[in-house]
Amino acid sequence: MSGDTCLCPASGAKPKLSGFKGGGLGNKYVQLNVGGSLYYTTVRALTRHDTMLKAMFSGRMEVLTDKEGWILIDRCGKHFGTILNYLRDDTITLPQNRQEIKELMAEAKYYLIQGLVNMCQSALQDKKDSYQPVCNIPIITSLKEEERLIESSTKPVVKLLYNRSNNKYSYTSNSDDHLLKNIELFDKLSLRFNGRVLFIKDVIGDEICCWSFYGQGRKLAEVCCTSIVYATEKKQTKVEFPEARIYEETLNVLLYETPRVPDNSLLEATSRSCSQASPSEDEETFELRDRVRRIHVKRYSTYDDRQLGHQSTHRD
């Protein structure tokens, strides 16, 4: 049994050195204060292996105790419970995190527990050999897969759709270069924000080059980079590179990293107040909601504000 209570000695009381006479105590419990974390265990568990703890509790080393009998060990107590489990059972389940394994190995080295040190070293080597990439970019294969990825993600989502097979016309002179720049910017952003944003590639959609931004499962904005122009007698597809707009929307989705707190009580309060509001207040509230809706709809326009492939809905 262990606790996390830090025991402070009484004013004027000083810890004292004493020899711990543990011979023949067997299953007697001792109380340990390891860096402020409190543990109870048996002398038998502490002396099963030839370690520094065995030297401490077999009388070969002096130990530091306070006036209440707690044996003080000046080490971090974070992993001491794991160390006790190893001393009792000769095996443990190691942490998954590499940093925590390193911390545990440092404590095992201090207490001279060679078996546990070997376990930690093997685990670290295995993790090194089976290294997983830090930045994974899913390529969606169906609309259902895309919906599931976005709905299940706890992070904001940035999706780049690029599909040259959707083009029916020839490209303008700079379109190939701009398409490549969009892809390069996507790669750059995914490396920069991979721990905070889920980046998705879509190569089966109906657009040629289009960015979509999601937060908390809903679509926030879209930047369509293509348009049809009449630069010559024939129609041509123009691909643009709205770099500043893409950066702006990417930074906007970072505002949705923290999940929203349910506000049912707030909704109830506002619904009650609205039912008692005057007609002028109702009109003002409707106007505010309408303004917000129009702002969001406007953000779905293309870079040059042409509604290519998207219907514009607004109120006059």
UniProtKB/Swiss-Prot annotation:
Keywords of this entry: Cytoplasm, Endosome, Nucleus, Phosphoprotein, Ubl conjugation pathway
UniProt pathway annotation: Protein modification; protein ubiquitination
Annotated CDD domains: BTB_POZ_TNFAIP1_BACURD2
InterPro entries, per the entry: BACURD1-3, BTB/POZ_dom, SKP1/BTB/POZ_sf, T1-type_BTB
Start and end residues of each BTB domain: 28-96
PTM sites of type Phosphoserine: S278, S280
UniProt GO BP: cell migration; immune response; negative regulation of Rho protein signal transduction; proteasome-mediated ubiquitin-dependent protein catabolic process; protein homooligomerization; protein ubiquitination; stress fiber assembly
Membrane-spanning residues: none
Source taxon at top rank: Eukaryota
Coiled coil region boundaries: none
Compartment(s) of residence: Cytoplasm; Nucleus; Endosome
Main location (coarse class): cytoplasm
UniProt key word rRNA-binding: no
Subunit structure: Component of the BCR(TNFAIP1) E3 ubiquitin ligase complex, at least composed of CUL3, TNFAIP1/BACURD2 and RBX1. Interacts with RHOA; with a preference for RhoA-GDP. Interacts with RHOB. Interacts with PCNA. Interacts with CSNK2B.
Family (UniProt): Belongs to the BACURD family.
Role according to the record: Substrate-specific adapter of a BCR (BTB-CUL3-RBX1) E3 ubiquitin-protein ligase complex involved in regulation of cytoskeleton structure. The BCR(TNFAIP1) E3 ubiquitin ligase complex mediates the ubiquitination of RHOA, leading to its degradation by the proteasome, thereby regulating the actin cytoskeleton and cell migration. Its interaction with RHOB may regulate apoptosis. May enhance the PCNA-dependent DNA polymerase delta activity.
Record's protein name: BTB/POZ domain-containing adapter for CUL3-mediated RhoA degradation protein 2
Source species of the chain: Pongo abelii
Organism lineage: Eukaryota, Metazoa, Chordata, Craniata, Vertebrata
